[in-house]
Protein backbone atom coordinates (compact mmCIF):
# COMPACT_ATOMS: atom_id res chain seq x y z
CA UNK A 1 0.00 0.00 0.00
CA UNK A 2 1.12 3.56 -0.73
CA UNK A 3 1.22 5.29 2.67
CA UNK A 4 0.46 8.77 1.37
CA UNK A 5 -1.41 10.47 -1.45
CA UNK A 6 0.56 10.02 -4.70
CA UNK A 7 2.09 13.14 -6.22
CA UNK A 8 0.18 14.12 -9.34
CA UNK A 9 1.69 15.58 -12.49
CA UNK A 10 1.44 19.34 -12.80
CA UNK A 11 2.69 21.77 -15.44
CA UNK A 12 5.36 24.21 -14.29
CA UNK A 13 5.92 26.36 -17.33
CA UNK A 14 4.72 29.74 -16.08
CA UNK A 15 6.46 32.09 -13.70
CA UNK A 16 4.40 34.09 -11.23
CA UNK A 17 6.63 36.14 -8.89
CA UNK A 18 3.75 36.92 -6.52
CA UNK A 19 2.83 33.24 -6.17
CA UNK A 20 6.46 32.24 -5.64
CA UNK A 21 6.90 34.93 -2.99
CA UNK A 22 4.02 33.45 -0.99
CA UNK A 23 5.26 29.86 -1.06
CA UNK A 24 7.38 30.07 2.13
CA UNK A 25 4.26 31.18 4.01
CA UNK A 26 2.29 28.28 2.54
CA UNK A 27 5.03 25.84 3.58
CA UNK A 28 4.76 27.27 7.10
CA UNK A 29 1.00 26.60 6.96
CA UNK A 30 1.71 23.01 5.90
CA UNK A 31 4.08 22.52 8.84
CA UNK A 32 1.46 23.90 11.24
CA UNK A 33 -1.19 21.62 9.73
CA UNK A 34 0.91 18.52 10.39
CA UNK A 35 1.47 19.57 13.99
CA UNK A 36 -2.25 20.08 14.45
CA UNK A 37 -3.79 17.33 12.35
CA UNK A 38 -0.99 14.91 11.45
CA UNK A 39 -2.57 12.29 13.72
CA UNK A 40 -5.52 12.09 11.30
CA UNK A 41 -3.22 10.44 8.73
CA UNK A 42 -1.21 8.31 11.17
CA UNK A 43 -1.20 4.53 10.75
CA UNK A 44 -2.65 3.78 14.18
CA UNK A 45 -5.34 1.24 13.31
CA UNK A 46 -4.15 -2.37 12.88
CA UNK A 47 -7.50 -3.23 11.26
CA UNK A 48 -7.56 -0.34 8.78
CA UNK A 49 -8.64 -1.38 5.32
CA UNK A 50 -8.34 2.14 3.94
CA UNK A 51 -5.48 4.54 4.46
CA UNK A 52 -6.32 7.62 6.48
CA UNK A 53 -5.80 10.89 4.62
CA UNK A 54 -6.70 14.51 5.19
CA UNK A 55 -6.70 17.33 2.61
CA UNK A 56 -4.91 19.71 4.99
CA UNK A 57 -1.90 17.35 4.92
CA UNK A 58 -1.58 17.35 1.13
CA UNK A 59 0.92 19.97 -0.05
CA UNK A 60 -1.11 20.55 -3.22
CA UNK A 61 -3.81 22.11 -1.02
CA UNK A 62 -1.38 24.98 -0.41
CA UNK A 63 -0.61 25.76 -4.04
CA UNK A 64 2.57 23.67 -4.04
CA UNK A 65 3.38 21.17 -6.77
CA UNK A 66 5.81 18.35 -7.47
CA UNK A 67 8.18 20.93 -8.96
CA UNK A 68 8.55 22.46 -5.50
CA UNK A 69 9.71 19.22 -3.88
CA UNK A 70 13.39 19.98 -4.45
CA UNK A 71 13.17 23.71 -3.83
CA UNK A 72 14.50 25.03 -0.54
CA UNK A 73 12.21 26.75 1.96
CA UNK A 74 12.65 28.13 5.49
CA UNK A 75 11.48 25.62 8.11
CA UNK A 76 11.25 27.68 11.28
CA UNK A 77 13.53 25.24 13.08
CA UNK A 78 11.78 22.02 12.06
CA UNK A 79 14.03 19.07 12.84
CA UNK A 80 16.80 21.42 13.95
CA UNK A 81 17.16 22.88 10.45
CA UNK A 82 16.62 26.47 9.35
CA UNK A 83 16.11 25.57 5.68
CA UNK A 84 15.29 22.37 3.81
CA UNK A 85 13.75 21.18 0.57
CA UNK A 86 10.01 20.56 0.55
CA UNK A 87 10.75 16.86 0.09
CA UNK A 88 12.83 16.82 3.29
CA UNK A 89 10.20 18.85 5.14
CA UNK A 90 7.47 16.38 4.20
CA UNK A 91 9.65 13.45 5.25
CA UNK A 92 10.36 14.99 8.66
CA UNK A 93 6.69 15.86 9.23
CA UNK A 94 5.45 12.41 8.24
CA UNK A 95 8.05 10.68 10.38
CA UNK A 96 7.13 12.85 13.37
CA UNK A 97 3.34 12.90 13.14
CA UNK A 98 1.97 10.36 10.67
CA UNK A 99 3.67 7.01 11.14
CA UNK A 100 2.67 4.49 13.82
CA UNK A 101 2.21 7.26 16.40
CA UNK A 102 -0.18 10.18 16.21
CA UNK A 103 -0.07 12.93 18.80
CA UNK A 104 -2.42 15.73 19.78
CA UNK A 105 -0.87 18.61 21.70
CA UNK A 106 -1.75 21.78 19.79
CA UNK A 107 -4.89 22.23 21.92
CA UNK A 108 -2.65 22.95 24.93
CA UNK A 109 -2.84 26.66 25.71
CA UNK A 110 0.59 27.03 27.35
CA UNK A 111 3.14 27.91 24.59
CA UNK A 112 6.05 26.53 26.62
CA UNK A 113 4.36 23.15 26.94
CA UNK A 114 3.56 23.07 23.22
CA UNK A 115 7.20 23.84 22.37
CA UNK A 116 8.36 21.11 24.75
CA UNK A 117 6.25 18.50 22.99
CA UNK A 118 7.14 19.89 19.56
CA UNK A 119 10.86 19.55 20.21
CA UNK A 120 10.47 15.97 21.34
CA UNK A 121 8.25 14.88 18.49
CA UNK A 122 10.36 16.54 15.80
CA UNK A 123 13.76 15.68 17.24
CA UNK A 124 15.83 12.62 16.45
CA UNK A 125 14.02 9.48 17.59
CA UNK A 126 16.33 7.46 19.85
CA UNK A 127 16.95 3.97 18.54
CA UNK A 128 15.90 0.93 20.55
CA UNK A 129 18.85 -1.23 21.48
CA UNK A 130 19.00 -5.01 21.29
CA UNK A 131 18.41 -5.55 25.01
CA UNK A 132 15.24 -3.49 24.93
CA UNK A 133 13.99 -5.30 21.84
CA UNK A 134 14.52 -8.61 23.63
CA UNK A 135 12.57 -7.39 26.63
CA UNK A 136 9.71 -6.22 24.38
CA UNK A 137 9.67 -9.63 22.66
CA UNK A 138 9.77 -11.43 26.01
CA UNK A 139 6.79 -9.48 27.32
CA UNK A 140 4.80 -10.10 24.15
CA UNK A 141 5.58 -13.82 24.31
CA UNK A 142 4.60 -13.99 27.99
CA UNK A 143 1.32 -12.21 27.30
CA UNK A 144 0.41 -14.36 24.31
CA UNK A 145 1.52 -17.67 25.83
CA UNK A 146 -0.59 -16.99 28.91
CA UNK A 147 -3.72 -16.40 26.84
CA UNK A 148 -3.09 -19.40 24.60
CA UNK A 149 -2.63 -21.67 27.63
CA UNK A 150 -5.84 -20.49 29.29
CA UNK A 151 -7.75 -20.91 26.05
CA UNK A 152 -6.42 -24.44 25.62
CA UNK A 153 -6.62 -25.62 29.23
CA UNK A 154 -9.85 -23.96 30.36
CA UNK A 155 -12.07 -24.12 27.29
CA UNK A 156 -15.28 -22.14 27.61
CA UNK A 157 -14.43 -20.42 30.89
CA UNK A 158 -14.81 -16.66 31.07
CA UNK A 159 -11.47 -14.90 31.18
CA UNK A 160 -11.84 -11.64 29.16
CA UNK A 161 -8.56 -12.11 27.36
CA UNK A 162 -6.07 -9.53 26.17
CA UNK A 163 -5.75 -11.16 22.74
CA UNK A 164 -5.13 -8.49 20.14
CA UNK A 165 -4.02 -6.02 22.79
CA UNK A 166 -0.93 -7.78 24.13
CA UNK A 167 1.16 -4.66 23.61
CA UNK A 168 -0.56 -3.27 26.73
CA UNK A 169 1.89 -5.44 28.69
CA UNK A 170 4.79 -3.81 26.81
CA UNK A 171 3.39 -0.37 27.63
CA UNK A 172 2.90 -1.04 31.34
CA UNK A 173 6.28 -2.74 31.59
CA UNK A 174 8.08 0.26 30.08
CA UNK A 175 6.06 2.78 32.12
CA UNK A 176 6.70 1.13 35.45
CA UNK A 177 10.33 0.34 34.61
CA UNK A 178 11.08 3.99 33.80
CA UNK A 179 9.15 5.12 36.88
CA UNK A 180 11.13 2.76 39.10
CA UNK A 181 14.41 4.11 37.74
CA UNK A 182 13.15 7.63 38.47
CA UNK A 183 12.49 6.82 42.12
CA UNK A 184 8.77 6.00 42.11
CA UNK A 185 8.09 3.68 45.06
CA UNK A 186 4.79 2.24 43.89
CA UNK A 187 2.65 1.97 40.77
CA UNK A 188 -1.08 1.76 41.47
CA UNK A 189 -3.18 0.36 38.61
CA UNK A 190 -6.93 0.42 38.08
CA UNK A 191 -8.60 -1.40 35.20
CA UNK A 192 -11.71 -3.29 34.17
CA UNK A 193 -11.81 -7.04 33.54
CA UNK A 194 -10.49 -7.07 29.94
CA UNK A 195 -6.86 -8.24 30.19
CA UNK A 196 -6.83 -8.18 34.00
CA UNK A 197 -5.53 -11.74 34.42
CA UNK A 198 -2.63 -10.99 32.09
CA UNK A 199 -1.73 -7.81 33.97
CA UNK A 200 -2.02 -9.63 37.30
CA UNK A 201 0.55 -12.24 36.29
CA UNK A 202 2.91 -10.42 33.92
CA UNK A 203 3.01 -7.00 35.61
CA UNK A 204 1.70 -7.18 39.18
CA UNK A 205 3.55 -10.34 40.17
CA UNK A 206 0.67 -12.71 40.91
CA UNK A 207 1.83 -16.27 40.34
CA UNK A 208 0.46 -18.41 37.54
CA UNK A 209 -0.33 -21.08 40.13
CA UNK A 210 -2.69 -18.77 42.00
CA UNK A 211 -4.57 -17.92 38.82
CA UNK A 212 -4.81 -21.57 37.73
CA UNK A 213 -6.09 -22.54 41.20
CA UNK A 214 -8.89 -20.02 40.77
CA UNK A 215 -9.77 -21.54 37.39
CA UNK A 216 -9.77 -25.00 39.01
CA UNK A 217 -11.98 -23.78 41.87
CA UNK A 218 -9.32 -24.29 44.54
CA UNK A 219 -9.96 -21.32 46.83
CA UNK A 220 -8.74 -20.79 50.38
CA UNK A 221 -11.14 -22.40 52.85
CA UNK A 222 -10.15 -20.41 55.95
CA UNK A 223 -11.75 -17.13 54.83
CA UNK A 224 -15.22 -15.72 55.33
CA UNK A 225 -17.53 -14.57 52.56
CA UNK A 226 -18.32 -15.83 49.10
CA UNK A 227 -15.34 -14.36 47.28
CA UNK A 228 -15.49 -13.02 43.73
CA UNK A 229 -14.72 -14.05 40.18
CA UNK A 230 -11.05 -14.14 39.29
CA UNK A 231 -11.20 -11.26 36.77
CA UNK A 232 -12.49 -8.87 39.48
CA UNK A 233 -9.72 -9.50 41.98
CA UNK A 234 -6.76 -7.28 42.71
CA UNK A 235 -3.34 -7.97 44.16
CA UNK A 236 -0.19 -6.40 45.51
CA UNK A 237 3.18 -7.57 44.28
CA UNK A 238 6.67 -6.60 43.21
CA UNK A 239 7.65 -5.51 39.72
CA UNK A 240 11.19 -6.31 38.56
CA UNK A 241 12.51 -4.16 35.74
CA UNK A 242 15.76 -3.74 33.86
CA UNK A 243 18.98 -3.75 35.89
CA UNK A 244 16.97 -5.69 38.54
CA UNK A 245 15.28 -2.50 39.74
CA UNK A 246 12.15 -3.26 41.76
CA UNK A 247 9.06 -1.36 42.81
CA UNK A 248 5.77 -2.19 44.45
CA UNK A 249 2.75 -2.69 42.19
CA UNK A 250 -0.84 -2.75 43.38
CA UNK A 251 -3.83 -3.58 41.19
CA UNK A 252 -7.14 -2.46 42.68
CA UNK A 253 -10.13 -4.80 42.65
CA UNK A 254 -12.96 -3.79 40.34
CA UNK A 255 -16.47 -5.12 39.63
CA UNK A 256 -17.88 -5.63 36.17
CA UNK A 257 -19.11 -2.05 36.22
CA UNK A 258 -16.08 -1.07 34.17
CA UNK A 259 -15.01 2.45 35.22
CA UNK A 260 -16.14 2.16 38.86
CA UNK A 261 -12.53 1.81 39.94
CA UNK A 262 -11.45 5.22 38.60
CA UNK A 263 -12.39 7.34 41.60
CA UNK A 264 -11.48 4.55 44.00
CA UNK A 265 -7.93 4.30 42.65
CA UNK A 266 -7.42 8.07 42.81
CA UNK A 267 -8.57 7.97 46.43
CA UNK A 268 -6.21 5.12 47.21
CA UNK A 269 -3.28 7.00 45.67
CA UNK A 270 -4.16 10.27 47.42
CA UNK A 271 -4.34 8.44 50.76
CA UNK A 272 -0.94 6.86 50.16
CA UNK A 273 0.54 10.27 49.28
CA UNK A 274 -0.98 11.93 52.35
CA UNK A 275 0.24 9.19 54.69
CA UNK A 276 3.77 9.31 53.31
CA UNK A 277 3.90 13.11 53.18
CA UNK A 278 4.68 12.97 49.47
CA UNK A 279 3.38 15.64 47.14
CA UNK A 280 3.77 18.62 49.44
CA UNK A 281 7.05 19.61 47.79
CA UNK A 282 5.90 18.82 44.25
CA UNK A 283 7.39 15.32 44.18
CA UNK A 284 5.23 12.20 44.21
CA UNK A 285 6.25 8.64 45.05
CA UNK A 286 3.14 6.82 43.77
CA UNK A 287 2.24 6.58 40.08
CA UNK A 288 -1.48 6.05 39.30
CA UNK A 289 -2.31 4.27 36.03
CA UNK A 290 -5.87 3.77 34.77
CA UNK A 291 -6.59 1.37 31.90
CA UNK A 292 -9.84 1.95 30.01
CA UNK A 293 -11.80 0.46 27.16
CA UNK A 294 -12.65 2.74 24.27
CA UNK A 295 -16.44 2.56 24.64
CA UNK A 296 -16.38 2.97 28.42
CA UNK A 297 -14.00 5.94 28.37
CA UNK A 298 -16.22 7.84 25.95
CA UNK A 299 -19.54 6.66 27.34
CA UNK A 300 -19.38 6.60 31.13
CA UNK A 301 -19.79 9.84 33.05
CA UNK A 302 -17.58 8.79 35.95
CA UNK A 303 -14.55 9.11 33.65
CA UNK A 304 -15.02 12.83 33.13
CA UNK A 305 -15.99 13.35 36.77
CA UNK A 306 -12.65 11.91 37.83
CA UNK A 307 -10.77 13.87 35.16
CA UNK A 308 -12.48 17.06 36.33
CA UNK A 309 -11.15 16.53 39.86
CA UNK A 310 -7.57 15.99 38.76
CA UNK A 311 -6.44 19.61 39.24
CA UNK A 312 -8.35 20.27 42.46
CA UNK A 313 -6.12 20.60 45.55
CA UNK A 314 -8.22 18.19 47.59
CA UNK A 315 -7.97 15.39 45.04
CA UNK A 316 -4.73 16.02 43.16
CA UNK A 317 -2.40 13.01 42.84
CA UNK A 318 0.38 14.50 40.74
CA UNK A 319 -1.02 13.25 37.46
CA UNK A 320 -2.49 9.98 36.23
CA UNK A 321 -1.53 8.06 33.11
CA UNK A 322 -4.69 6.99 31.25
CA UNK A 323 -4.39 4.11 28.78
CA UNK A 324 -7.26 3.36 26.39
CA UNK A 325 -7.19 -0.13 24.88
CA UNK A 326 -9.20 0.47 21.72
CA UNK A 327 -11.03 -2.71 20.77
CA UNK A 328 -13.15 -0.64 18.37
CA UNK A 329 -16.31 -2.11 19.86
CA UNK A 330 -18.27 -1.73 23.08
CA UNK A 331 -19.62 -5.24 23.74
CA UNK A 332 -21.82 -5.28 20.60
CA UNK A 333 -21.77 -1.56 19.76
CA UNK A 334 -19.56 -0.26 16.95
CA UNK A 335 -17.69 3.04 16.95
CA UNK A 336 -20.25 4.86 14.82
CA UNK A 337 -23.02 4.01 17.28
CA UNK A 338 -21.06 4.44 20.50
CA UNK A 339 -19.72 7.99 20.43
CA UNK A 340 -20.02 11.28 18.54
CA UNK A 341 -16.29 12.07 18.49
CA UNK A 342 -13.42 10.97 16.27
CA UNK A 343 -11.51 9.37 19.14
CA UNK A 344 -12.70 7.99 22.49
CA UNK A 345 -10.02 10.20 24.11
CA UNK A 346 -11.43 13.48 22.76
CA UNK A 347 -13.13 14.44 26.02
CA UNK A 348 -9.70 14.64 27.70
CA UNK A 349 -8.74 17.64 25.56
CA UNK A 350 -10.55 19.92 27.97
CA UNK A 351 -7.87 19.24 30.57
CA UNK A 352 -5.01 20.49 28.37
CA UNK A 353 -3.26 17.12 28.29
CA UNK A 354 -1.29 15.59 25.40
CA UNK A 355 -2.91 12.58 23.76
CA UNK A 356 -1.01 9.83 21.95
CA UNK A 357 -2.51 7.38 19.47
CA UNK A 358 -0.32 4.38 18.76
CA UNK A 359 -0.70 1.27 16.63
CA UNK A 360 -0.94 -1.75 18.92
CA UNK A 361 0.71 -3.93 16.27
CA UNK A 362 3.88 -1.78 16.49
CA UNK A 363 5.28 -2.73 19.91
CA UNK A 364 8.44 -0.65 19.53
CA UNK A 365 6.29 2.43 18.93
CA UNK A 366 4.21 1.48 21.97
CA UNK A 367 7.39 1.34 24.05
CA UNK A 368 8.53 4.68 22.65
CA UNK A 369 5.25 6.34 23.64
CA UNK A 370 5.55 4.86 27.14
Predicted regions and their residues:
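Extended, charge-enriched "interface" segments that sit outside catalytic cores
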Residues: 1-168, 184
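Structural signal for hydrophobic packing residues in well-ordered secondary-structure cores
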Residues: 31-35, 93-101, 120-125, 141-144, ...
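Active-site pocket-lining segments that scaffold enzyme catalytic pockets across diverse folds
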Residues: 145, 149-209
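A generic structural micro-environment signature
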Residues: 46, 50-53, 63, 68-70, ...
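Cofactor-binding active-site loop characterized by glycine-rich and histidine/acidic residues
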Residues: 188-360
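Weak global preference for isoleucine
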Residues: 2, 31, 89, 108, ...
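Generic recognition of stable, solvent-exposed alpha-helical segments in well-folded globular domains
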Residues: 22-29, 42, 84, 88, ...
Amino acid sequence: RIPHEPVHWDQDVTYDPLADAGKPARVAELIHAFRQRGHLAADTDPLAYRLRRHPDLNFSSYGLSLWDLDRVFPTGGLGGKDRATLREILQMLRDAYSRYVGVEYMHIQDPAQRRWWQERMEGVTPSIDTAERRRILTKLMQAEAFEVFLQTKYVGQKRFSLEGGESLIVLLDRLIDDAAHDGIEEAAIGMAHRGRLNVLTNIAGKSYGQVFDEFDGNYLTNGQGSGDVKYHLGTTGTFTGTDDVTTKVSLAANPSHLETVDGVLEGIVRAKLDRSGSGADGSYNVLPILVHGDAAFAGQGVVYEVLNMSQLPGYHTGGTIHVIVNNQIGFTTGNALGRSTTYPSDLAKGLQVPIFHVNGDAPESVARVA
